[in-house]
Amino acid sequence: MGPLSAPPCTEHIKWKGLLVTASLLNFWNLPTTAQVTIEAQPPKVSEGKDVLLLVHNLPQNLTGYIWYKGQIRDLYHYITSYVVDGQIIIYGPAYSGRETAYSNASLLIQNVTREDAGSYTLHIIKRGDGTRGVTGYFTFTLYLETPKPSISSSNLNPREAMETVILTCDPETPDTSYQWWMNGQSLPMTHRFQLSETNRTLFLFGVTKYTAGPYECEIRNSGSASRSDPVTLNLLHGPDLPRIHPSYTNYRSGDNLYLSCFANSNPPAQYSWTINGKFQQSGQNLFIPQITTKHSGLYVCSVRNSATGEESSTSLTVKVSASTRIGLLPLLNPT
């Protein structure tokens, strides 16, 4: 974090003792010409880590300084101050016990929390011509590194075109913006999407296969941005009208009959077969070896989706003809 001046090991005074001192220090409010800058080390800090607000180009003849949380300079936002004469540190109402003030005006914040993000104001008081003081105010904004977001859903398994899904980008983070992507692109302009006022929540109306995702959300502040892992909705749909393969209908006695049925469905559909209105078997495939003319009739494949409750069926008329055997003609002996 760079060299620091050791914090004074002298008397610590509670903020109430600052009332008179603060009024005197703030009496003169003239602009300063010192090019004071404040730098965060490290530039991006994660929650739970430490950050140093390092002050550069501190002016000479320093009388003292005051740190405020935010840009309002009052006792409520007062964190700490340092008085050069006597090396006195004074703590205010905004002091959390995690701040350490140094004689070079730098401020160490330990175990950073979300509440620590935001602007800080450094009030520097410099000795003047012996009768007046010169003060300057320098504002710095601390940005926490955005956490990796995640997407929570009110329903990860919606029924197609029937249910509304609410996606939320977590966590809720102050002083950040939220943005959403679908299929790696910005959200299309459609009545099926609606965002909350903060963009943190996305409403999906009547989800279809075209709006099932994948979805990503991003949390961004002025210092960093982080994007979530993609989330794809498991869209429950179907079954569509089933298809029987092969569609061949004419057979001969002694042939093997093999039929397969398929319907697009999520979750996979349940299959059953009937022949001439009589249940034959369950399953997607039907196999009957060495069929006879008795196997002629109407073959129906029925499908059902247990999740959507939808059903569908299709039929195939099979005709089985008797085999015709061609015998050998007798040899005619010439006379």
From Swiss-Prot:
Localisation per UniProt entry: Secreted
SMART domains membership: IG, IGc2
Coiled coil: none
Ig-like C2-type domain ranges (all copies): 147-234, 239-317
Known glycosylation sites: 61, 104, 111, 199
Membrane-crossing segments per the record: none
Main location: secreted
Gene Ontology cellular-component annotations: cell surface; extracellular region
Signal peptide region: 1-34
Family as reported in the entry's similarity comment: Belongs to the immunoglobulin superfamily. CEA family.
PANTHER family listed in its UniProt record: CARCINOEMBRYONIC ANTIGEN-RELATED CELL ADHESION MOLECULE 19, IG-LIKE DOMAIN-CONTAINING PROTEIN
Name under which the protein is recorded: Pregnancy-specific beta-1-glycoprotein 2
Organism, scientific name: Homo sapiens (Human)
